[in-house]
Amino acid sequence: MDWTWRFLFVVAAATGVQSQVQLVQSGAEVKKPGSSVKVSCKASGGTFSSYAISWVRQAPGQGLEWMGGIIPIFGTANYAQKFQGRVTITADKSTSTAYMELSSLRSEDTAVYYCAR
C-alpha cells in the first residue's frame, strides 16, 4: 500500500457506563488526502435526544482533541475553531445515530476518532 497517498482513519467505540448507554461506531477507514470521510455513532440503552454527543480524536503520540458536538433534540452543532468549515456533525433521532463528516483530509488527520456522551 502506498502510504504516501493514503493514511489511516480510525474510529473506536466508547461506552457511557453510568447511564448504561452504549455507543457503537463504524469501523476503520483508509482515505486519500483531499477526500472526506463520514463516520457514525449509534446509541443504545438510553435516551439519545437529550444529551450531547461529542466527537474527539487522538493523533499518534498526542492528547485528546475536541472537534465538536451536538445535542440531538436541538440539532445544532458546535465546532472547535480549528475544524470550522471542515467538519459537519449531525444526528438522526429516528435511528439514535450521530454522524461526523470531515472533509479535505490531510495526513495530520490520521488519528483515532471517538464519539462520547
Swiss-Prot record:
Chain positions covered by the region annotation Framework-1: 20-44
SUPFAM superfamilies: Immunoglobulin
Region (Complementarity-determining-2), start-end ranges: 70-77
Residue ranges of every copy of the Ig-like domain listed in the record: 20-117
Framework-3: annotated segments: 78-115
SMART domains to which the protein is assigned, alphabetical: IGv
Reported function: V region of the variable domain of immunoglobulin heavy chains that participates in the antigen recognition. Immunoglobulins, also known as antibodies, are membrane-bound or secreted glycoproteins produced by B lymphocytes. In the recognition phase of humoral immunity, the membrane-bound immunoglobulins serve as receptors which, upon binding of a specific antigen, trigger the clonal expansion and differentiation of B lymphocytes into immunoglobulins-secreting plasma cells.
Protein name (database record): Immunoglobulin heavy variable 1-69
Source organism phylogeny: Eukaryota, Metazoa, Chordata, Craniata, Vertebrata
